[in-house]
């Protein structure tokens, strides 16, 4: 019966989702007395807002280019309407499903006043139906030379839905919204803005038994760790929200956009720019830009391993024998490892396990003499492991509960989140004393132990009905939680005095996470070839997140999520997948391995001499373009432009680049990379924009008129080309020749 309920619930969710996706966008009727409000232009700093009384339309331009509209309402239709609704939100282990019951829909809009007051355009009127109404105010004001702020507020806040509707062009593509992993162009989709567990499979797993077991944890094509209310479009338009509550960008119709925010107050900014890179640079003045990585990160591979001191020494020796450049060892099980129903997980009690890693100080010192760092792991959960783990010195869960540092339920009890086969409390980051306490744990238990960085995991699971110390609504704080988690980690390394030399990498993110985090990684991809949750999704998400300011990002080499249930199809890492992920990752910002959720089932780099040599080769290739990577990291820090780029950013006038989803990417402005992302393939297609391109491996030249080429004989390498006359391309190729890695 329990299984039947799960299957029924899953089918119901799918049905509701599909029905919702087919619903037409409701555009409100607009009532205006044009005799009282005739056509007029309003100067708002560098912007001109034009009211056309005949078309019943607002249009906004920047005075730097009066021919280009950066925002316009739909002709003869309203642009604001509202509703009163009841939230119906279900969550499980950081996965959420949002539904609502609409009580009243206010489908008519009136405009009663348009006034220029203190260089702000103030528009007032009502949204209403035959029975109820509320007054609204919309204020436009300049936010610098390239941003126009808009602020919509309902007088009666029982109407807790604001809908903001405006026009789009038929062929306009929309990019961004954080780390969208299933598609790069979001046109035709509804994009929810909510930091989430991305889910297992996200639609790639078709086995009904697995999906029934997963339930909400299966995810869907729009559930993502990094969710940001921001986009750029191929019409060189851009917009972002300042709201932190749940919202939806409805792009399902070709000629309009509708933003649905679950609030009575909507605040955002419209960005003006002449190119996609200009739009990103302007946006990141708000989101923040990522600081430069410590130089040691680029010196070689970051090796993810578990198993203790002796195993680390053994695997280090094997890597050294192959001449593998190593930047760090990442030992996520520094706190000890537990076996759960899904595989190998960790004891979430943030102190060193001296039994698993004896002679720790000696290990740190020995690695340090070879210029190799040691990295660890932490997250904002705390598990009560008393009586389960025998060698604990601190009961961190007890400390948190005693001091009131855990998020609570309405009855005052700690809100325990079900993980796999254990529960964990989530620390309350709205409590200033808790923030000091967790920072001291990071300083005392991680930094003082010699760790030079760590994975700062999770931060997606704050429940919708939680009770917070500050009294803030979790509906507004949920997305902020990940930003604050990044901020605390950043403050800990800065206050320790080692800030420039340390790096932590996070998987979750909201609008201003790039301001605080030193690095991102893409979370838990399935160890598969899928487009929704596999190697392809990692490539799509990497390029998508770069649009929204996540300029330094990478994925686990080989993927992470392993599915090993009896009877049904298993998902375990193959040697071929591991090798292809190695090849792809060598051309991204960070080259880091992960054993995966079930290390004994997944193929590892140490499982054969062939894969160990392959890994060593690509670690050398990764190191060989360090000189250019550092230039791009500097550029990301000063402009917000990502290191790894979708080709559209460099070739915005080439319409063919808009069709690229995961198939290829650019390193900076000079290299085009097309990894092999299909099983049992040794060739791939690569689109090269107009010009002459040089093959990195053999120096042959391809002259392109803006066309695709089939590149063959890619048994153990991706297709990589650089622009003719690129000095960085020449240096990279010469470095490879010196290493014996290119002809």
Which positions does each model-derived feature cover?
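Sec-dependent signal peptide recognition
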Residues: 2-10
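Bacterial N-terminal signal peptides
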Residues: 9-17
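Boundary at the C-terminal end of the N-terminal hydrophobic targeting segment
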Residues: 21-23
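Catalytic and substrate-binding clefts that recognize carbohydrates or anionic sugar/phosphate headgroups
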Residues: 25-296, 302-306, 316-321, 650, ...
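Secondary-structure transition/capping motifs at alpha-helix termini
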Residues: 291, 320-327, 356-375, 398-399, ...
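Aromatic-lined carbohydrate-binding/catalytic grooves of carbohydrate-active enzymes
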Residues: 292-471, 514
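Alpha-amylase-like alpha-glycosidases and glucanotransferases acting on alpha-linked glucans and related
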Residues: 403-451, 486-527, 593-611
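Catalytic core of carbohydrate-active enzymes
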Residues: 490-503, 508-522, 545-555, 560-743
């Amino acid at each position: 019966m329990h299984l039947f309920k799960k299957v029924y619930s899953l089918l119901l969710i799918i049905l509701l989702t599909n029905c919702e996706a087919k619903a037409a966008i409701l555009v409100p009727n607009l009532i205006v007395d044009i005799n009282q409000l005739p056509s007029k232009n309003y100067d708002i700093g560098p912007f001109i807002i034009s009211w056309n009384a005949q078309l019943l339309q607002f249009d906004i331009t920047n005075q730097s280019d009066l021919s280009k509209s950066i925002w316009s309402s739909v002709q003869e239709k309203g642009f604001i309407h509202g509703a009163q609704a009841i939230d119906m939100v279900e969550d499980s282990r950081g996965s959420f499903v949002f539904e609502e019951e609409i009580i009243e829909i206010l489908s008519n809009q009136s405009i009663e006043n348009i006034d220029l007051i203190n260089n702000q355009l103030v528009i007032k009127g009502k949204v209403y139906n035959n029975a109820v109404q509320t007054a609204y105010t919309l204020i436009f004001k300049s936010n610098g030379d390239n941003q126009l702020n808009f602020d919509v507020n309902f007088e009666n806040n029982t109407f807790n839905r604001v809908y903001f509707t405006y026009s789009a062009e038929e062929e306009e593509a929309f990019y961004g919204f954080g780390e969208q992993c299933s598609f790069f162009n979001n046109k035709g989709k509804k994009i929810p803005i909510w930091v989430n567990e991305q889910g297992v499979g996200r639609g790639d797993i078709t086995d009904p038994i697995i999906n029934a077991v997963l339930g909400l944890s299966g995810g869907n094509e729009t559930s993502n760790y990094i969710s940001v209310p921001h986009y750029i479009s191929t019409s060189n338009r851009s917009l972002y929200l300042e709201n932190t509550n749940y919202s939806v960008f409805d792009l399902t119709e070709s000629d309009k956009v509708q933003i649905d925010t679950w609030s009575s107050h909507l605040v955002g900014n419209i960005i003006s720019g002449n190119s996609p890179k200009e739009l990103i640079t302007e946006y990141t003045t708000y989101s923040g830009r990522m600081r430069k990585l410590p130089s040691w990160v680029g010196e070689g591979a970051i090796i993810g391993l578990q198993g203790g001191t002796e195993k680390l020494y053994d695997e280090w020796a094997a890597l050294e024998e192959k001449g593998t450049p190593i930047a760090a060892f990442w030992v996520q099980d520094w706190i000890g490892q537990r076996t759960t129903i899904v595989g190998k997980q960790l004891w979430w009690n943030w102190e060193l396990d001296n039994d698993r890693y004896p002679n720790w100080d000696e290990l740190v010192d020995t690695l340090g003499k070879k210029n190799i760092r040691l990295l660890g792991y932490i997250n904002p959960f705390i598990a009560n492991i008393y009586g389960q783990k025998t060698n604990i010195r601190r009961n961190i869960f007890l400390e948190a509960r005693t001091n009131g540092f855990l998020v609570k339920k309405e009855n005052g009890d700690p809100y325990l989140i079900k993980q796999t086969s254990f529960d964990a409390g989530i620390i309350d980051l709205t409590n200033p004393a808790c923030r000091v306490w967790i920072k001291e744990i990071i300083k005392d238990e991680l930094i003082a132990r010699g760790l030079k960085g760590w994975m700062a995991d999770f931060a997606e699971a704050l429940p919708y009905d939680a009770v917070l110390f500050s009294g803030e609504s979790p509906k507004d704080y949920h997305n902020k939680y990940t930003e604050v988690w990044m901020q605390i980690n950043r403050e800990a390394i800065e206050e320790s005095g080692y800030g420039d030399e340390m790096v932590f990498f996070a998987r979750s993110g909201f609008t201003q996470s790039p301001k605080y985090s030193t690095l991102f990684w893409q979370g838990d991809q399935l160890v598969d070839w899928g487009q929704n949750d596999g190697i392809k999704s990692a490539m799509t998400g990497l390029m998508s997140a770069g649009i929204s300011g996540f300029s330094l990002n990478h994925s686990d080499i080989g993927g992470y999520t392993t599915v090993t249930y009896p009877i049904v199809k298993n998902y375990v890492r193959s040697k071929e997948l591991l090798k292809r992920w190695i090849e792809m990752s060598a051309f991204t910002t960070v080259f880091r391995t992960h054993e995966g959720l079930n290390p004994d089932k997944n193929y590892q780099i140490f499982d054969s001499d062939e894969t160990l040599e392959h890994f060593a080769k690509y670690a050398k290739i990764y190191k060989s373009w360090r000189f250019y990577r550092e230039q791009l990291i500097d550029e990301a820090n000063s402009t917000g432009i990502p290191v790894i780029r979708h080709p559209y950013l460099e070739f915005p006038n080439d319409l063919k680049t808009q069709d690229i989803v995961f198939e290829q990417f650019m390193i900076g402005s000079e290299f085009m990379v097309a990894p092999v992302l299909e099983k049992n393939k040794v060739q791939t297609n690569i689109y090269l924009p107009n010009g002459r391109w040089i093959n990195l491996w053999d120096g042959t030249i391809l002259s392109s008129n803006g066309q695709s080429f089939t590149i063959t004989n890619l048994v153990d390498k991706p297709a990589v080309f650089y622009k003719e006359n690129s000095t960085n391309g020449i240096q990279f190729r010469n470095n490879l020749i010196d290493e014996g890695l290119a002809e």
